[in-house]
């Protein structure tokens, strides 16, 4: 009997494991749904029938709707939504339930005026727009966490629940310059520096007679677009970032306490220009079990920059997480027919598991009422509904092979302080990062965006593109990476300033000059130096020579490099004389390469191709230009022809199209803007 019980228990464990495994091998297609716009239960039932007919598996609900659940202080109204959740469960549609802690309700702004935004000129702003709350305000946080507690307790065990959404677009919204915010900033500075002397030293306040004698003399820096006081601005942006992260962690802790088995997800637009913050703190914590973004690739079918930009967004939100990624918002609007489908297949190659269209119903009111959804304003499905239905039908055929697990051998370094510091340079850090990412997009190769201080750096090749702020921890990890056999490529604007934002007074690249075997002098402005160009170049144009091959590029500036043991790999050859611009230095078991120009594909491409061979980095699938491709596992390949011409795929083996249920005996052709998923026989 005892043995029989053990067998039964073991069987249950195995079934649970297999169920979890099958759940992971799944793709979700669905929509963002706003039942609070019309609580008519018959309309909701009709919508759900249409969702079922389309093969939808998921809806995202609740975002931006705090006062639909708490219309006045402490008065919760979940009854209407309980019925919606029950209907979703009956239809076997899973729910991502956003905890809508922003925007805060008007009643909360009225009760606590301190939570309203104060602009940099001291004007208190009425919350006419969304995200108009000071998220660091203790009164705001008290009520946001109370709302989180109520909602998660109420729905933690609902069978329709797939995940709780943690805020929405946390990097968007205004920064508040209120007195309460200033006092919190002062407290943050006290905790960091402990003394006024340390603060004055870090901020170089002797410059322009700005010495601080007591804490209360501290004011805010100018608006975020100002170039004044870079040291102070860097600390202020760290403070803003810390407040956002602290709130997100508090919300996550409440969710995990009340609903320990629930997945967590956010639409992480951390790189909004308004409140750009350091999302790596969340990403590396592991507490956000499903990273996410809004995949808005634009309306075009024939251009691909939108797909590239949004796929890059996945990479810089996911960092090194191996969990599936969720695109919890996805284009509808006026996207050209088949462009949504193109984007959906492209997203699979970056680990995406979910295509959740924004939005289901074209909304009847508000600022977004002209953003067309899958249903027109009268509830009649339009062509976007049909396209999402097609995506759901096709994804069902291939889902057991997904989500794709990236196999990256290359890391691309991101640094939040460097993004803030780089506003003083012609090329911002994130633009250099994307230029490096683009290199691998064109080669159909996996990469990971990494935060060096948090990463184990288990890569063969590491790019450090314009990482301006160099601290002891980061420099030590780069040094160890190279010493132990790694190859690093660092581009201009890197290791310029220390962690306070002050330019290194020692030899640059700061803390790493010996590693690279160079001394960086000053920079030159290309446009003025072209007055003496041997080739009569004008503007920002430069000729770069790599291994005897002349390549045209452009750059606002270029570095003056003195060799201190490094060898020259490339030169600028169009100016008054040759200037060494790409160098290589052996260090330990590895190699450190410096490029005195911002990251550009034409400058780095040939070097990368050489390093792929030299370091035995696995190449992407061999496909014609204009085809995205990934080898999903040992005998399955995903393709997306993103061009307007048919593309022939070279194939020696026999294969079968799982998408279109046909056999190939060798090479096969993919039609323009069409996907293909094949199994090698």
Where are these regions (language model features)?
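Bacterial N-terminal signal peptides
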Residues: 9-19
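Conserved, mostly hydrophobic/aromatic
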Residues: 31, 51, 59, 88, ...
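Aromatic-lined substrate-binding rim segments of carbohydrate-active enzymes
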Residues: 45-54, 58-124, 152, 251-258, ...
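Carbohydrate-binding surfaces of carbohydrate-active enzymes
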Residues: 299-681
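The substrate-binding groove and active-site-proximal loops of carbohydrate-active enzymes
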Residues: 29-40, 64-79, 126-145, 170-174, ...
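Polysaccharide-binding and catalytic clefts of secreted carbohydrate-active enzymes
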Residues: 125-290, 294-309
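Short, well-ordered coil/turn segments that N-cap beta-strands
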Residues: 25-29, 55-57, 89-95, 157-162, ...
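Short, acidic/polar
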Residues: 38-53, 144-150, 274-284, 310, ...
């Amino acid at each position: 009997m005892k043995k029989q019980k053990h067998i039964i228990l073991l069987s249950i464990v195995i079934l649970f494991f297999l169920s979890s495994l099958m759940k992971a091998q799944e793709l979700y297609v669905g929509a963002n749904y706003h039942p609070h716009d019309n609580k008519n239960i018959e309309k909701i039932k009709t919508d759900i029938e249409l969702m079922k007919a389309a093969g939808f598996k998921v809806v995202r609900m609740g975002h931006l709707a705090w006062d639909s659940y708490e219309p006045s202080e402490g008065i919760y109204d979940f009854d209407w939504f309980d019925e919606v959740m029950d209907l979703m469960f009956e239809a076997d549609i899973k729910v991502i339930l956003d905890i809508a802690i922003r925007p805060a309700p008007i009643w909360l702004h009225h009760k606590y005026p301190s939570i309203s935004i104060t602009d940099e000129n001291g004007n208190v702003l009425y919350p006419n727009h969304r995200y108009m709350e000071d998220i660091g305000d203790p009164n705001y946080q008290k009520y946001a966490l109370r709302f989180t507690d109520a909602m998660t307790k109420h729905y933690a065990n609902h069978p329709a629940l797939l995940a709780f959404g943690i805020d929405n677009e946390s990097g968007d919204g205004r920064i508040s310059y209120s007195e309460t915010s200033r006092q919190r900033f002062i407290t943050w500075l006290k905790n960091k520096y402990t003394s006024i002397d340390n603060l004055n030293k870090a901020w170089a306040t002797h410059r322009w007679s700005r010495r601080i004698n007591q804490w209360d003399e501290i004011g805010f820096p100018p608006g975020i677009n100002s170039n004044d006081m870079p040291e102070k601005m860097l600390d202020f942006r760290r403070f803003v970032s810390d407040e956002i992260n602290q709130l997100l962690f508090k919300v996550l802790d409440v969710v995990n306490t009340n609903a320990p088995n629930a997945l967590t997800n956010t639409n992480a637009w951390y790189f909004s220009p308004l409140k750009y913050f350091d999302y790596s703190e969340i990403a590396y914590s592991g507490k956000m079990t499903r990273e996410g973004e809004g995949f808005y690739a634009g309306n075009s079918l024939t251009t691909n920059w939108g797909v590239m930009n949004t796929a890059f967004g996945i990479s810089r939100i996911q960092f090194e997480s191996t969990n599936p990624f969720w695109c919890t918002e996805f284009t509808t609007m006026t996207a050209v027919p088949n462009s949504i489908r193109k984007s959906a297949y492209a997203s699979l190659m970056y680990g995406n598991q979910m295509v959740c269209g924004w939005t289901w119903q074209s909304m009847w009111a508000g600022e977004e009422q002209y953003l067309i959804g899958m249903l027109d304003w009268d509830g009649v499905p339009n062509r976007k509904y049909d396209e999402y239905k097609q995506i759901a039908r096709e994804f069902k055929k291939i889902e057991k092979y997904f989500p794709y697990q990236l196999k990256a051998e290359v890391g691309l370094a991101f640094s939040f302080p460097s993004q803030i510091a780089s506003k003083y340079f012609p090329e911002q850090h994130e633009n250099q990062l994307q230029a490096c990412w683009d290199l691998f997009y064109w080669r159909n190769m996996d990469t990971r965006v990494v935060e060096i201080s948090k990463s184990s750096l288990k890569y063969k090749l590491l790019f450090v593109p314009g990482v301006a702020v160099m601290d002891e921890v980061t420099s030590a990890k780069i040094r160890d990476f190279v010493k132990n056999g790694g190859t690093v490529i660092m581009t201009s604007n890197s290791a310029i300033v220390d962690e306070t934002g002050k330019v290194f007074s020692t030899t640059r690249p700061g803390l790493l000059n010996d590693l690279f075997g160079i001394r960086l002098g000053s920079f030159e402005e290309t446009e003025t130096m072209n007055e003496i160009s041997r080739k009569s170049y004008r503007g920002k144009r430069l000729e770069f020579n790599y291994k005897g091959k002349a390549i045209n590029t452009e750059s606002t500036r270029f570095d003056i490099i003195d060799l201190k043991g490094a060898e020259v790999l490339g030169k600028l050859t169009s100016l008054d004389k040759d200037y060494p611009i790409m160098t290589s230095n052996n260090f330990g078991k590895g190699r450190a390469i410096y490029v005195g120009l911002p990251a550009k594909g034409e400058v780095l491409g040939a070097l990368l191709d050489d390093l792929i061979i030299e370091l035995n980095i696995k190449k992407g699938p061999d496909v014609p230009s204009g085809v995205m491709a990934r080898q999903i596992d040992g005998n399955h390949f995903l393709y997306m022809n993103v061009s307007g011409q048919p593309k022939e795929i070279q194939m020696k083996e026999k294969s079968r199209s799982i998408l279109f249920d046909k056999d190939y005996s060798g090479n096969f052709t993919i039609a323009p803007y069409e996907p293909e998923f094949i199994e090698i026989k």
